[in-house]
Design a protein with these regions (language model features):
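Beta1/beta-strand and adjacent pyrophosphate-binding region of the FAD-binding site
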Residues: 7-21, 38
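Short hydrophobic core segments
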Residues: 14-16, 200-212, 348
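Active-site substrate-recognition segment that forms the wall
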Residues: 27-31, 57, 86-91, 184, ...
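Glycine-rich FAD pyrophosphate-binding loop
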Residues: 30-50
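Dinucleotide-binding Rossmann-like beta1-alpha1 core, especially the glycine-rich loop
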Residues: 54-133, 283, 291-293
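Short beta-strand to alpha-helix junction loop
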Residues: 68-71, 97-106, 146-165, 279-286
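Helical element adjacent to the flavin cofactor pocket in flavoenzyme catalytic cores
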Residues: 146-203
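C-terminal catalytic lobe of FAD-dependent flavoproteins
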Residues: 296-389
């Protein structure tokens, strides 16, 4: 295993963070011919958000910027098993966005128009179609539902295993439990990193450390928008098949799907201040249970198997921070990911191309690291997350 190998004295590119973002980037860099790629992670295998997410793959949102980016990522998910040579277990079961309020129905009307503009295959379901797609849903509560047939789910454990195997087969050196303790600069640009007393030279560094993104940016001496935030999820005991597609209950800030084993997995967001903890709590559990019970009454008898929390890095507009850092040549960032599992294939591909060629793809450009300094946030009204007050 690469983790048993000694650290090199230098690397062509160092990636800090070996979650799905870091591994996707490493794989794509290797596909572009980059050698001597080093990936360092302070935690254990699948110990971060890449091992603690809801596994949903959503291929479109309500803004053109998010839709174009995540539609590309969804398309890449569909061919990812063949490309990696490992089964990522992507299931194209669809994704249904459900609205209860009239204002949410209007949002879904506008969302459909965005999808048509972007060439996305989606449709507003009639009451009859919705009963076919989600027969167990409390239809009397629904004002509108928009369905994305090409979206679905992909278990994080399968995707992470596939990316890691593909990276190591291409010679990428991956080291877990290897925290970076300092970031060096030389002549006004990135010069390398330090792991304890050892210095590893490199003129290209990528910060893909999830919830530790702000701490890593501080280490590099550069500003970075955003903050770490705890998200929680719940799994119910297995039950008979009730929910076919993945589901977003927009008005309840709740997302969910049913696994092949029959467990309903998902979570609801509640307004809370940013917390750097993995402790699960009762308010989120109660909000999730209420959403399940009211919108899928047949789940009322099901017991909660487990509730867990994961840490992500959230930007001001909830969008990714992706690309070169404007304050330090040689430094790149992949942060701000509240939908990092779904966006990993596109992020890895587009960021790798930007690093190697210097050309920024139009689907990636809106998520530039310095967009807030330029007063150009990306407004996305269709996310299932809560702002804190």
């Amino acid at each position: 295993m690469n983790a048993l190998k000694p650290l090199p004295a230098k690397a062509s590119i160092i990636i800090v963070g070996a979650g799905i973002q870091g591994l996707s980037l490493a794989f794509n860099l290797s596909e572009l011919g980059v050698r001597d790629i080093l990936v360092l992670d302070a935690g254990y295998w699948q110990g971060g958000a890449s091992g603690r997410n809801g596994t949903l793959i959503r291929g479109a949102f309500s803004s053109p910027e998010w839709t174009r980016f995540f539609a590309h990522s969804c398309e890449l998910w569909q061919g990812l098993s063949k490309r990696l040579g490992q089964n990522v277990m992507y299931s194209r079961r669809g994704y249904t966005m459900v609205g209860e309020r009239s204002a949410t129905a209007e949002l879904l009307d506008r969302t459909l128009a965005v999808h048509k503009e972007c060439g996305i295959h989606s449709s507003l379901l009639t009451p009859g179609q919705l009963r076919e797609v989600l027969p167990a849903l409390a239809h009397g509560r629904v004002s509108a539902a928009l369905h994305l047939p090409d979206s679905g789910v992909a278990p994080h454990h399968a995707a992470m295993h596939a990316y890691r195997q593909a990276c190591e087969a291409r010679g990428v050196s991956i080291h877990y439990r290897t925290p970076v303790t300092a970031i060096d600069q030389s002549a006004g640009r990135i010069g390398g990193v330090r792991v304890g007393d050892q210095r590893i030279a490199s003129d290209t560094l990528v910060l893909a450390g999830g919830a530790e993104s702000n701490a890593l940016a501080q280490m590099a001496g550069v500003p970075l928008d955003g903050y770490p935030m705890r998200l929680e999820a719940m799994a119910l005991e297995p039950t008979r098949p009730l929910i076919g597609p993945a589901v977003a209950l927009l008005d309840r800030l709740c997302y969910m799907h049913q696994t092949a084993r029959g467990e309903v997995v998902g979570g609801a967001e509640v307004a809370e201040r940013p917390q750097h903890t993995l402790n699960a709590d009762v308010p989120v559990m109660a909000a999730t249970a209420r959403a399940y019970l009211e919108m899928f009454p047949q789940l009322g008898h099901a017991r909660i198997l487990r509730q867990w929390a994961g840490l992500v890095h959230i930007s001001k507009d909830f969008g990714p921070l992706l690309g070169a850092h404007h304050a330090l040549p040689g430094l790149f960032v992949s942060a701000g990911w509240c939908y990092g599992h779904a966006g990993a294939p596109a992020a890895g591909e587009l960021l790798a191309k930007a690093i190697v060629s210097g050309q920024v793809d139009e689907r990636m450009r809106p998520f530039a690291v310095d967009r807030f300094e330029r007063n150009q946030p990306v407004v996305e009204p269709g996310i299932v997350l809560s702002h804190f007050e």
